Amino acid sequence: MHLAFVIDPDRLVQDGAALQRLAVALVSDGVRVRRVLPAARDDAPLSRLIPASTYDFDGSPLFRASRLGTLSSELEEDRPDAFVSFGARAFEAAAELARDLDAGLVAMVSSARELDATPLRRHADRLDLVGASTGPVALRAARQVGDELATVLPLGVATPDGGRTPPPPAEGIAIAGPGRDDGAYRAVFSAIASLMPSMPDLQVAIELPAGHDPGLWALARELRVQRVLNGVTSLESIRPLALACGVMALPEAVGGTRSIVLEAMAMGRCVVAMEDAMADHLIDGVTALVAGERDARVWGSLLSAGLRNPEVASRIGAEASVRTAARFGSARCAAQLAQACETVVRGPAIPFPGAAASDA
């Protein structure tokens, strides 16, 4: 079987490491993989062994057909059996290529926001399957494309080896999120301010991606927490440091999954998150500490428990690690994707559990 992964810039930044592991796992199992990537990228050594083509996702729409035509001609010589898209913009390109080369089409979706931005209905006649990262996202997809075309099919992440203990957590917080909800960040910053007097070494890494609220720094100055904040464009750019933090905080709902959060859970880190109806893997008191409201006292209590209560943090982290490995382990997810694509390419019937199925 020959698969083409079409990966747009947003998903490459967010899930680059997970996608690399997925491709390597599939190749090691005898699946041929070609990647279609943004022109500017920095491949890891193992990824360089996997064939790649480039596509300008950010180019002018006027020349889009020409760019796709050139890519289609390149792929014609070694035609993939199916295109697997990662990201809304990638799906558009994958759908056109699948139509042109008469190949299967699978959309991998990590969040409700990404799902809503993906033009599934426009290419419904070509679409074979939507693989959603969680049960609620799969149910949402099923309302667009039908139950028979939506299933739970997450992108896996690395999990610690059985004999290796993750390094002990540092006295730090990694804040993941788009930085757009002023009320959510006010609650979190206020909670951090309440911790600072008793935690003089506390450091916080905070994402400030494109489109974040420019007033966040003013808010940080107002609440006097700016001296402990360290802004980065993405936690992925400082992955080792982010995963070393004792707590990963999600002030805003992710609306599904995010690889670096799953990696933190797999390592036994304590996740403190805003309530998220699309994230069925974040179970309050079991795999995470979940805040039901944007309240500084609530967040202060949860962050304090994650950083200063070893019994709570270790219990949550241990359960999160076990469940994340069982549900989102990269080897398991690679095997699921291979089986799904094999069915798309060869099958007549699709023996998928459907959108209603989700592991606890």
Kindly give the residue locations of the regions a language model identified:
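Short alpha-helical donor nucleotide-sugar binding micro-motif in glycosyltransferases
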Residues: 233-235, 240-245
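A short, active-site helix/loop in glycosyltransferases that binds the activated sugar's phosphate group
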Residues: 120, 124-150, 159
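Short hydrophobic beta-strand element within catalytic cores of glycosyltransferases
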Residues: 270-274
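Conserved acidic donor-binding segment of nucleotide-sugar-dependent glycosyltransferases
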Residues: 284-285, 289-296, 305-311
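Acidic donor-binding loop of glycosyltransferase active sites
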Residues: 243-256, 269
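A short, well-ordered alpha-helix in the C-terminal region of glycosyltransferases
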Residues: 305, 312-327, 333
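Nucleotide-activated donor-binding/catalytic signature segment of Leloir-type glycosyltransferases, i.e.
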Residues: 214-234
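Short His-centered aromatic/hydrophobic patch
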Residues: 85-90, 109
